[in-house]
Amino acid sequence: MRVFNFSAGPAAMPEEVLRQAADEMLDWHGSGMSVMEMSHRGKEFMSIHEAALTDLRDLLGVPASHRILFLQGGGIAENAIVPMNLLGARNTADFVVTGSWSQKSFGEAKKFCTPHLAASGKTENGFTRAPTRAEWQLSDDPAYVHLCTNETIDGVETFEIPDLGDVPLVADVSSHILSRPMDVAKYGVLFGGAQKNIGMAGVTVVIVREDLLDRALSICPSAFEWKTIAANNSLYNTPPTYAIYIAGLVFQWLKRQGGLEAIEARNIEKSKLLYDTIDASSFYLNKVEPAARSRMNVPFFLADETRNEDFLAGAKARGLLQLKGHKSVGGMRASIYNAVPLEGVKALVEYMKDFEQRDA
């Protein structure tokens, strides 16, 4: 029996994708091979690779000025890879810290430069807001400005993206990429691990403006140098072939759903239902300012936290899994990525109401 999986990542996958992957496991399109067994330079995998790149470009509307790269290492590795590729002759990068992940990015950058804290969304209740552009205090000559546009742990999403002129904007989009349309031209770099909305863990997507490919530090390993990866069409070293294949199936699935406009409408409906339930209750609490609430990751707390384990046990009994909040903040967290259906959110809301009524 399939359950409703609210994991923050690795996360729920579209059932259609899982079934297609299962059907093709032993024999991909009459090749007699599993995708796992293919040479990454053979014609079979090359067709998978090129289709994935093309479909992602179509879905996001990536302009010709930007290259799409498939790398490894996840978002954590990109926290080091970004400064090694973008600092050039500069020694400062600016950071807008809106939660735990951008805080990690800020800390990692200290190994390569003197990072400048341009703005913070931290309040007495933790990270609960997204600073406006007017609050950003940029340094005089930063190599780039870093922003995590959706904080997976804290549930803070930044929707208003400013134009920074000549300063490249770098965005960690790991946990909301493909959940809504984006103006990719506004960004110098977008990066994200796949294991939330793109597919399975193992591949990292980087979208970089082509004119930024000549800034790498001499210490940057060639396997992580974007210019080298771009020149070799993401095949400089053996790529995570099966993860790219799964990502390609997800891209095709998204197209069949009507693209990102249709997906965004679904995600708005799902998140509104859950937030409305929380706000109407005196038993559940979300601390994030409404304008900055994530559509993908919804943290909430029980008024009586001694009931946390009872809540989780009851949810599991109903087939509602992976609702425990991150250890750094506690409480609960429902990650409602693209693959989580509206029926799953309705089932969660029904359970939350039943649990509150029973507790009362």
UniProtKB/Swiss-Prot annotation:
UniProt keyword terms in alphabetical order: Amino-acid biosynthesis, Aminotransferase, Cytoplasm, Pyridoxal phosphate, Pyridoxine biosynthesis, Serine biosynthesis, Transferase
A Pfam family of this chain: Aminotran_5
GO MF term (any one): pyridoxal phosphate binding
The keyword Amino-acid biosynthesis appears for this protein: yes
Record keyword Cytoplasm present: yes
Binding residues for L-glutamate: R41
InterPro entries for this protein: Aminotrans_V_dom, Aminotrans_V_PyrdxlP_BS, Pser_aminoTfrase, PyrdxlP-dep_Trfase, PyrdxlP-dep_Trfase_major, PyrdxlP-dep_Trfase_small
Cofactor(s) this protein requires: pyridoxal 5'-phosphate
Enzymatic reactions: O-phospho-L-serine + 2-oxoglutarate = 3-phosphooxypyruvate + L-glutamate; 4-(phosphooxy)-L-threonine + 2-oxoglutarate = (R)-3-hydroxy-2-oxo-4-phosphooxybutanoate + L-glutamate
Biological process according to GO: L-serine biosynthetic process; pyridoxine biosynthetic process
Major site of localization recorded for this protein: cytoplasm
PROSITE patterns linked: AA_TRANSFER_CLASS_5
Main EC class the enzyme belongs to: transferase
Binding site for pyridoxal 5'-phosphate: W101, T152, D172, Q195, N237, T238
Subunit structure: Homodimer.
Family per similarity comment: Belongs to the class-V pyridoxal-phosphate-dependent aminotransferase family. SerC subfamily.
Role: Catalyzes the reversible conversion of 3-phosphohydroxypyruvate to phosphoserine and of 3-hydroxy-2-oxo-4-phosphonooxybutanoate to phosphohydroxythreonine.
PANTHER family the record matches: PHOSPHOSERINE AMINOTRANSFERASE
Protein name: Phosphoserine aminotransferase
Gene: serC
